Structure formats: structure tokens, C-alpha cells
Amino acid sequence: MSNETKCPFSHAAGGGTTNRDWWPNQLRLDLLSQHSSKSNPLGGDFNYAKAFKSLDFAAVKKDLAALMTDSQDWWPADFGHYGPLFIRMAWHSAGTYRIGDGRGGAGRGQQRFAPLNSWPDNASLDKARRLLWPIKQKYGQKISWADLMILAGNVALETMGFKTFGFGGGREDTWEPDADVSWGKEKTWLGGDLRYGKGAAGKDEGVVVADEALHGTETSRTDSGRNLENPLAAVQMGLIYVNPEGPDGNPDPLAAAHDIRESFGRMAMDDEETVALIAGGHAFGKTHGAGPADNIGPEPEGADLERQGLGWASTFGTGKGADTITSGLEVTWSNTPTKWGNSYLENLFGHEWELTKSPAGANQWVAKDAAETIPHAYDPAKKLRPTMLTTDLSLRFDPAYEKISRRFLEHPDQLADAFARAWFKLIHRDMGPRARYLGPEVPAEELLWQDPIPAVDHPLVNEQDVAALKQKILASGLPVSQLVQTAWASASTFRGSDKRGGANGARIRLAPQKDWAANEPEQLAKVLKVLEGIQAEFNGAQSGGKKISLADLIVLAGGAGIEQAAQKAGHRVTVPFTPGRMDASQEQTDVQSVGALEPIADGFRNFLKGKYNIRAEDLLIDKAQLLTLTAPEMTVLIGGLRVLNVHTGQDAHGVFTDRPETLSNDFFRNLLDMRTEWKPLSEARDVFEGRDAKTGAKKWTGTRVDLVFGSNSQLRALCEVYASEDGQEKFVRDFVAAWAKVMNLDRFDVA
């Protein structure tokens, strides 16, 4: 009997019930292996920075400028100019950034992939990217999609008469969706029921139209009772920022202002930057709501195969041009929608406004008794009355926003400068330091939000200096644990998401880092005082201007401690050290912005700032992912830091060794010892006690972070490698390599 003819075949690779179906709370170790070389078609040897430097930048800009007015029949340009569409594409690419965890943003070209390519707020941007394809095809790998989408937005502004602040390339494409970014827990588009205590239940249509049956007729919420879950910055699932109709579709400008301030603030924008972005962005283009939402087909990820990745097919009229349905709103703000000017603010303050409905049924506003002065996007003989969104009226009726908006109305030059700077910040916020910027249009001005660090202006230490400094450090009386902990505290602020933080700059000695609970301020101050003394003595004895920065000395001290600990375990190692870090000043440090880097948890130091509804082991994965660590690197660092007695606070949880400050594999050997029985010390199950299975004698205490390395099957398999009889040497070698990686994560100057 043929199995092929008699037995149904319904299980392709990856099909069937998965481990996460059985165990939904399984540890997300997969987050530590995303964006690997196996998903990258360019290979490990491809150097994007080198490729970008060979790009004919002027030619790309010329081609982009020509595209702006080259309207295509398959997707015509509003007002004969694609500029507003490309501004929206660039804005929505960058606008997913949130300062809380640094995730989102334009830096990886993620708008090409799910879920972003199918968010309701990104409707029709699939067409924008297809319009760009001939240019991307022409220049190939010399410019990434991530850079091209942002550059297209810049060129769009320039072709409509606006002078931009500059452009820095260097955004390297990824080839699969980011799995580490939480966009919220809602299961329906436009839902907000889980990110707020009370919010919209959501819906599935790909347009932002209020649905009274779902949203209700909720009254205004203008106080702080509307609390958005951290680190989210968008108010509803599938939106970039806020609902343009108002909170959950409620057309209340003051309630909307609360959402705007919260959302833009979480994207690192203050009130002036927020007003500038809205007023500047809405100087151009229009929204699209020509007909009811039920004319719209599935988003790109849900569309049929023959649609070839395009979504939101419309059966309304021609489905394009004047018949386009995108947001469900039908608003044109400016009298000159393809030319920079102040018409947006002039209209906003020059008319009184009454609530109306778009053809799609969305709440919007129309100027009372106003003349028809707004051009039609496709009929030059037709004029329209000025229209606004609820969120536009927020700029007039919120007292703080109104003050700024009126100043911009009276001083258009101030708006132009503020918008140029805010736009530049928006599209570069996740790129990290200026050292990463590429191309001929990088502005010379240094901006505070870029976390500036002085350029090296003196000769650096050589090998002999390094050896002498190590001796001084080890003779200072500072214990190995404190040397290592201080270096870790300095370097582990790095976030691979937005490339911020790290040891360079030595901001650990400045506010706010010097006062963070994770850094044990009293102990930190003592360590820094000793290291500053060594630094001053060394620098004072040099001729020719040679110096060592405190940033370098902190890292060197950690390495010296590790070398001594390895020697105690019988291994001679040299921890790699590359000088060249510099010390930032307090004036170069935005305290509020840097405050976003403060760890609420650092499993590598067994630190939890408070009690959270997220498991400590999940917070460890989050931290490891931000540090760009693999699962083996995370594992070996935990084992090494524990035996080096690195921990925050007095409780030596996880120090599974009777010879602390010796770089041994004791953590792994003792964790996997079957002669130890573990029991939780409280109902919270956050701290555990390990006792001898025979005698009952207390041996160790450990946290959830410690015990997960023996509990989780994958982590236990990694621990077994290092706990084996032949694992000690590999452990030391791998620990030193992982340590050096963390110490150098922010060294873009030597990468």
C-alpha cells in the first residue's frame, strides 16, 4: 500500500504543535540568535560602511528627486508629487522608536517586514517602497533599504522647498522581522485594551475609523489616569503614535493632547519638538478616506499570493488616486501641500472648527464658514474648505502647545529651524553616536541627544604603560569583585537597540549614573576615587601629553581583576584592551535622556530594582539581547561574574563557590550537583535555598536567574559544557572573549 496515496500529508517542516503551544511561558532564548549570518544573503564578509562610502550619493539624490514628480498610473501621486508619501514612509520607519528600551526605529529597515509592513497606520506605504524599488535595484547593496527610505524622506522635503539639517547613512538592513520588540499584547488591530487599564477593544480593519460599538461614547480623559504600559509609546496596536481622531476615536483635542505628549515624550521628543514635527509634517500632503473601510482588502501579510506583497486592495472606485482609502480620514491641511510654508498654522489659528465626518465615517474637523482655498489632489479646477484632525486642534487648545504654535505662527523661521532639527533627531535617534554616521551630509554641529564624547586629543598608552597601570590597580587594595563590577556597570549600559550607552565617556562617574541603585553609589564612589588617583598620578608623570582617560582605566581595571582571578585558578590570560575611550563632561550629558538607560534589572549582577510582573529570568534575556549576547555568551558571563563575587547588595545569591574571586567553573559544577536540593524561601519564589540532600546543611542561596540555568533544558545543556572536567579552560577562554565583547560594544571608532 502506498503511503503517498493512502495517507494524508499535512505537516510541512515547522508544522504541528510547537513547544510554545505546549509551554507558552517558555524562556525566549531564540531572541539571542536572531539576525544571524544564516538569514543574511550578503555573507559575513560584507561591510556596509565600505559599500556606502563607494555610493554616488549625489546621483542617488538626483534619482530620488526625479522620482518625486514621476507619477505612476498604478499608484498616482497626490498633487503630482510623491514627496508627502515619502515623508510619511520615512516618518513611520523612524517613528516606531521608543526611548524606554531603544527598540524600534529606522535603523534596520524593519518596515519591510511583519508586523510593521501590515500595521493599519502603515497602509499604502507598501506602494511607497515599491516606487523606490527601481532606485534600490540600480544601486544595489551600496545603499540599504533602511537608509534609502530615510533619504527619500529627506529628498522629499528638499524638493518641496525645505532646507533639512542633514543626513547620516549607516543603517544596515536586517533580513527577518525583529522578534525582540514588544508592540503590545493586544490581539486585534487598533486595540488598546491591554496597554491601558481601560482602552479600545480594537478591530481588524486596516483604517483608523472610530467604531462606536467597540469604542463606546467615552468621555474625555485628560488627566494622568490614562497610564500607558512601559516601554510602549503608541496608544493602540498598529499605530505609530496616537489616534488622529482622538483617544480611542473620541474627538476631544485636550484628551488627544495628553496622548500626544505621552507618546512623543516616549519617543524622546519634548513639547517644542513635538509641535515642530506635527506643524512641519502637516505642511505637506493629505490623508486618505475617500470611502467606507469595508472596501479595503487584507494587509500585505494577509493578502493573496498573486498580490505579490501588496496589501489593502480597494474596491472603491478606481482604488487609487482620488478614490484612495488609507487612514479613513480625508484631510488636507495646507493651501500649498507640495511647498514648504506656514499655511498649516495660518489655517489652524485662522478659522473656527466644527466636527464632521469623513466619507469613511471618521471624526475630523472642517473650518466654519471658510472659503474653499485648499487644492484638490487630482482636480485642479476644484477647491476645498480647510480641514484638520483632532490631534491638529490639540496644538491650538492645549495651553503649552498653543504657546509654542503661536510663536511658530509669528516666527516661521523658528518653525523651520525647529522642524529641521526635530526631523533630524527623529530619523537618527536610534543610530547611536555620530561616529556611526556616514556620507557627505553629516552636520558638523554636535547635539546633546547624541551623547557626545570628546575626540581623542592626546597620545594613548602603550603596552608598557598598560602593564604598569595594571600593577598599580592590583596594588591599590581594591578587591577583584569591585574592579570587575565597576567595569561591568560602566560598559553594560550599552543597548544594541539604539547603540547608546557603554563604557566610552565614563558617564558612570556623572549624574545620573553615579546615583543608580544598580551601581551601589557608595561603593562606586570609593572605587572611582582610587582609580581617579591612579589616573592623576600616571597622567602627571607623563611627557608629551600622553594620558589615560578614566573611561579606559575603568575597563583596564576590570580586565586586570579578571587576569588575577584567572591566575588564581591556574590560567594565564590576557584580557584584550584597546585604549582610546574619552571622558564626557556633565555638560555633555542629558540627565533625563541618559536616565532611560538605568537598569530596572541586571541578572548579571543579580539585581532587581523592584518587584515586577515579569519574571527575573525574562528580564535577563531582555538585558542579554540588548547587549547583543548569544545564549552561550550570556551563560559564560553569568558563571564567571558569579564566582568573581559580582553582585549588587549584600546578599551573595548565586555565588556557588567556596573560593570567590577565582575564575573557576564552580558555578556550573555546583549548580548541576545532584546532591543539592533547592526550595523557595517565600511564596514569591524569587529566592531559593540549596541544601545538602543527605545532611540538610545549607550550601547556597540563589535567585530565579541563577536557578534557570539548571532548570531550562537549553541553558542546562550549555552549563554542562562548562561544568565538565575538560570545561575549565574553555570556560576561562570563553568568559574573557565575552567580557571583551561587552567592554567594546560602543567602540564604533575602532570597529
Swiss-Prot record:
Gene3D superfamilies: 1.10.520.10, Peroxidase, domain 2. GO terms for cellular component: cytosol. InterPro entries: Catalase_peroxidase, Haem_peroxidase, Haem_peroxidase_sf, Peroxidases_AS, Peroxidases_heam-ligand_BS. Keywords: Heme, Hydrogen peroxide, Iron, Metal-binding, Oxidoreductase, Peroxidase, Signal. It catalyses: H2O2 + AH2 = A + 2 H2O; 2 H2O2 = O2 + 2 H2O. One of its GO terms (molecular function) is catalase activity. There is a cross-link at residues 241-267 (Tryptophyl-tyrosyl-methioninium (Tyr-Met) (with W-91)). The active site is at residue 92. Residues 1-12 form the signal peptide. Binds 1 heme b (iron(II)-protoporphyrin IX) group per dimer. Its cofactor is heme b. Formation of the three residue Trp-Tyr-Met cross-link is important for the catalase, but not the peroxidase activity of the enzyme. Pfam families: peroxidase (PF00141). It comes from the Bacteria. It is an enzyme of class 1 (oxidoreductase). Bifunctional enzyme with both catalase and broad-spectrum peroxidase activity. PANTHER family: CATALASE-PEROXIDASE, HYDROPEROXIDASE I, BIFUNCTIONAL CATALASE-PEROXIDASE. HAMAP family: Catal_peroxid. Belongs to the peroxidase family. Peroxidase/catalase subfamily. This is Catalase-peroxidase. It comes from Cupriavidus necator (strain ATCC 17699 / DSM 428 / KCTC 22496 / NCIMB 10442 / H16 / Stanier 337) (Ralstonia eutropha).
